[in-house]
Amino acid sequence: MKLNIKYILALALILLTGCGQSQQFMAVPPDARKEDVPRQSIQLKAERFKFTPDVIRVKAGTLVRLEITSVEGTHGFQLGAFGIDERLDENQTKIIEFYASKQGEYGFRCSHFCGIGHMGMTGKVIVE
């Protein structure tokens, strides 16, 4: 019985630690909502095992507004570096905003199993 309690406590600690870390990411920090912050809107389609476009280029310091439409089936959009993971229902458009604060390449993927080609449903955001 003591062994089970130790495992439960260890698991709870791991889960709490993980939740605390994910809270450090903010898709849109309060300062990024100021009027003088550059903005860029991008339309994205999620369809049968692909995102179109699958490469998105933005400038560092930009507030990015993604308008993502799932045109075929239910998908997900996960951009882990920015703490984003959203469900995309078929024929729905979801608005996702994030602040591209730091240069680099950040992968995104479908986070909702959508069929045999699911693992290849990926893309990247390039912050220049």
Predicted stretch roles:
Residues 19-31, 88-128:
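Extracellular/periplasmic metallocenter environments
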Residues 9, 34, 48, 56-58, ...:
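Generic marker of residues within folded, mature protein domains
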Residues 12, 30, 54-56, 82, ...:
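Short linear sequence elements within intrinsically disordered, low-complexity coil regions
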Residues 3-4, 38, 79, 83-85, ...:
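Generic structural signal for short, solvent-exposed loop/turn connectors between secondary structure elements
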Residues 46-54, 79-83, 91-95, 108-109:
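N-terminal post-signal-peptidase region of extra-cytosolic proteins
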Residues 1-48:
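Extracytoplasmic entry segments of secretory-pathway proteins
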Residues 76:
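Pre-active-site segment of Zn-dependent metallo-hydrolases
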Residues 37-43, 54-73, 92-102, 126-127:
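Beta-strand cores of secreted/periplasmic/IMS beta-sandwich domains, seen most often
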